Amino acid sequence: MKLSIFFVLFFIAIAYCQPEFLDDEEDEVEETLPVAEEGREKSCITWRNSCMHNDKGCCFPWSCVCWSQTVSRNSSGKEKKCQCRLW
């Protein structure tokens, strides 16, 4: 549901933009986007210990899912793992 609302708002924003504005923005984005995305991917694709302090928005538009798992087969200790997921 959140994803569909995002796309609707995204397309509305594009529909109201001036073509000259989009051309200028595309040039700027092409220069900075690969570096920003590469840095974000490296920091976001990691296991987390909690979903708090997700200030980089790594999981958007997905959600952060956490669960507990045992450390090893013969151990009763558990550790918390978190990951960004679509479901």
From Swiss-Prot:
Signal peptide: 1-17
Cystine bridges: C44-C59, C51-C64, C58-C84, C66-C82
UniProt keyword annotation of Phosphoprotein present: no
Tissue specificity field: Expressed by the venom gland.
Superkingdom: Eukaryota
Subcellular location: Secreted
GO CC annotation terms, alphabetical: extracellular region
Propeptide: 18-40
A single GO molecular function term of this UniProt record: toxin activity
Keyword annotations: Calcium channel impairing toxin, Disulfide bond, Ion channel impairing toxin, Knottin, Neurotoxin, Secreted, Signal, Toxin, Voltage-gated calcium channel impairing toxin
Main location class: secreted
Record's miscellaneous remark: According to the nomenclature proposed by King and colleagues (2008), 'Gsp(267)' comes from the species name 'Geolycosa sp (strain A267TDLS2-KZARNA)'. This species has been reclassified since that study, as indicated in the work of Oparin and colleagues (2016).
Family label: Belongs to the neurotoxin omega-lctx family.
Function per UniProt: Modulates Cav2.1/CACNA1A voltage-gated calcium channels (P/Q-type currents) in rat cerebellar Purkinje cells and hippocampal CA1-CA3 neurons. At saturating concentrations (>10 nM) decelerates activation kinetics and slightly increases peak amplitude without affecting deactivation kinetics. In vivo, does not cause death when intravenously injected into mice. In rat models, through its activity on Cav2.1/CACNA1A, has an ameliorative effect on memory defects provoked by hyperstimulation of N-methyl-D-aspartate receptors (NMDARs) in the hippocampus.
Domain notes: The presence of a 'disulfide through disulfide knot' structurally defines this protein as a knottin.
Name this polypeptide is given: Omega-lycotoxin-Am1c
Organism from which the protein derives: Alopecosa marikovskyi (Wolf spider)
